[in-house]
A protein has these predicted regions:
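Short Pro-Gly-centered flexible turn/kink motifs
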Residues: 524-537
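Active-site/ligand-binding surface loops and adjacent short beta/alpha elements
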Residues: 489-519
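Beta-strand-rich interaction surfaces with strong enrichment in secreted/lumenal proteins
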Residues: 435, 518-523
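Terminal, non-catalytic domain-edge segments
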Residues: 1-41, 231, 235-238, 251, ...
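Non-catalytic terminal regions with compositionally biased, polar/charged low complexity
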Residues: 538-620
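Ser/Thr/Asn(+Pro)-rich, low-complexity disordered segments
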Residues: 1-110, 364-366, 371-387, 400, ...
Length: 620
């Protein structure tokens, strides 16, 4: 029978009053003994953290929904409304609901999410009526015995990373802390803490960047760490050493940078409950000061915990209205330590973000699979998210992506964030991807560069596709190859710089925008192809005239063909930019628009005097 203590084993140091109450079988006496001797004293929760009763709700979508788990969600929601640490009066009013729901477990044990809920109630609702508290302690201890003695049966199902952290890390730690009088409790808590520490090291780099494989369910993965840190602080325990605390703090900061102004995290599946309240609480328990940029950013978004409860725990119905360009980002910081951008080879992810302000411009790229994933937002409004698909054909034959991607260049400075990804399509063919996000000028540049070293290459076709979010409305310009996409109040202009501007002019490729994707296709008879796509979302340039064209690149008086170098010039209103990429190397400098350079790639702004001010320069 679940919840019985027939095989209970006590520590020699266990309080005799607690042991006698359990043996006597009187729940009221047991409840009084538990309140006095059987549970750790829990301190008052910080005002920066969400109510303790609501914290298990962060993980509800991590497990299969059942009538019992739905009832647990409702119960936790009601308890959370009673305060951060519900008092005796509030718990007396809710006691019947707790008892009624507890009766549903007389025949079978709870699943991990439900057990987490009951343990949370036991830890933070010690003011329950004595008889009910005793009954809850008895049942919860019975359910926890297999965890305490390490005899939990291995199930055939494969747990996701977030489920594994909760089941193998958080639950053993919580059980060990709450049932400290039982034999094996200390080892159990230590075992759980060890799992959590190892998972932090295994799934994050030394700077705290979580691995790209976690992004889809990142808040679900983070939640057990946050709750564990909160319980450890509330009970005066320490589950991390100094290095672990630093890593956890860094993880929280990196996760906050992945949060958009609409309250969702980049590349997530959207099913996570109240990620903003999770991240705010994470900042609190990780020790980020109130003046920290990440804390200020999250505070400016607004709370989602109340909305979570009102909507029955579904964050899909909690989405905020997009901010749009009406609310500008804060002035971009100049100090490197204040910039939220980061890149990690180990975690296979790059986070490009212009600042910590609400209404951020951001681009997150994950390169842990055969196709990189990309997530783009402008002024806090997400407009692209999903697989950044590519297709390359050499002499008409498809060359699939089969090798891993690596980040071969990363830079974050006062002008922009920049990343390069590279993969070998074959022994002779290389695909290079460039991403540049402007710090203050509100544009992003995406470039695919394909090169073949084979002299037999006579035809090269390449297509890249950028996945758009739901609700996109595309529109094609009447006379040029410019497209515009609109989502809410946000409008982006899309310029295929590698194609001729005028629609009536012949072009070796096409740009097509649908409700689902931006697809750029280009082709050449050479062995190298550069495919630049410039996306502008500046409100000031929304209706400005535009012109783009190729530029002449010379070396020692010789004009270079497209197989050796590619240069494009773009003008929008009074703003002009140059993009230059050298497909071949040379010990001599090359010249374009008066700029003499030895760099492989140059992205620069053309001033009113015709001078080139580099935004990004990349060595070969």
């Amino acid at each position: 029978m679940p919840g019985t203590l027939a095989e209970i084993s006590w520590k020699k140091s266990a309080p005799s009053a607690l042991v006698d109450a359990v043996n006597a079988g009187d729940d009221a006496d047991l409840g009084r003994a538990v309140r006095k001797f059987g549970l750790p004293e829990v301190g008052r929760a910080s005002s920066r953290s969400v109510a303790s009763m609501w914290q298990p709700l962060w993980s509800q979508s991590g497990f299969e929904s059942t009538p019992r788990s739905d009832a647990m969600v409702e119960l936790l929601a009601r308890l959370g409304k009673a305060g951060r640490k519900p008092g005796r009066k509030a718990l007396l009013e809710l006691a019947d609901s707790v008892a009624e729901h507890l009766a549903d477990y007389e025949e079978s044990s709870p699943d991990p999410f439900e057990l987490l809920g009951w343990l949370t109630i036991l830890a933070y609702c010690q003011a329950l009526p004595a008889e009910l508290l005793g009954r809850l302690w008895r049942d919860a201890a019975g359910w926890s015995l297999p965890i305490l003695d390490g005899s939990v049966a291995e199930e055939a199902i494969v747990l996701s990373a977030d489920q594994r952290v909760l089941v193998d890390g958080e639950l053993p730690y919580v059980c060990g802390r709450l049932f400290s009088g039982l034999r094996g409790a200390r080892r159990c808590a230590a075992r759980g803490a060890k799992v959590l520490r190892k998972e932090l090291k295994r799934s994050c780099d030394i700077d705290g960047t979580p691995h790209a494989r976690l992004l889809e369910r990142l808040p679900l993965w983070l939640a057990p760490f946050v709750r564990t840190a909160g319980l450890a602080r509330a009970t005066g325990e320490d589950w991390l050493d100094k290095a672990g605390r630093t890593r956890f703090r860094n993880v929280v900061e990196r996760c906050a940078a992945l949060c958009r102004s609409n309250g969702e995290t980049a590349l997530s599946n959207g099913a996570v409950c109240a990620p903003v309240s999770l991240l705010k609480t994470a900042c609190d328990v990780a020790g980020l000061e109130t003046g920290h940029a990440a804390v200020r950013f999250l505070a400016s978004i607004g709370d989602d915990d109340e909305r979570l409860v009102r909507n029955g725990g579904s964050s899909r119905s909690n989405k905020r209205m997009p901010l749009g360009p009406g609310r500008r980002s804060a002035s971009p910081p100049t100090k490197k330590k204040d910039r939220p951008a980061s890149q990690s080879d180990e975690s296979q992810m790059a986070c490009l973000r212009n600042n910590w302000g609400v209404g951020e411009d951001s681009c997150v790229v994950a390169f842990d699979g055969t196709m990189p994933r990309i997530d783009l937002a402008a002024f806090g409004v997400p407009w692209a998210s999903g697989d950044w698909v590519t297709e390359t054909r050499i002499n008409g034959q498809l060359v699939p992506v089969t090798n891993e991607w690596r980040c071969c260049c990363w830079c974050s400075d006062s002008d922009a964030d920049y990343a390069e990804l590279e993969t070998q399509l074959s022994d002779d063919v290389t695909l290079l991807r460039q991403v540049l996000l402007s710090r203050a000028d509100h544009f992003v540049l995406l470039v695919d560069i394909v090169q073949s070293k084979s002299p037999e290459t006579t035809g090269l076709q390449h297509t890249m596709s950028i996945p758009l979010v739901d609700g996109i409305e595309p529109a094609q310009d009447a006379v040029t190859r410019e497209w515009a996409i609109t989502v809410g109040r946000l409008r982006l202009r899309v310029f295929p710089l590698g194609l001729e501007q005028e629609s009536v002019d012949r072009a070796d490729g096409s740009l097509v925008v649908t409700n689902d994707a931006i697809e750029l296709a280009q082709q050449t008879s050479d062995n190298g192809l550069v495919c630049p796509l410039f996306l502008d979302f500046s409100p000031a340039r929304r209706k400005k005239g535009v012109a783009w064209s190729g530029v002449t690149i010379a070396e020692d008086g010789r004009t270079l063909p497209a197989s050796e170098a590619s240069g494009r010039r773009l003008r929008i209103g009074d703003h002009q930019w140059l993009y230059l990429h050298n497909l071949t190397r040379s010990e001599m400098g090359r010249t374009a628009l008066g700029l003499h350079t030895f760099y492989e790639t140059v992205i620069g702004e053309i001033t009113a005097r015709g001078e080139i001010e580099p935004v990004m320069q990349v060595e070969s």
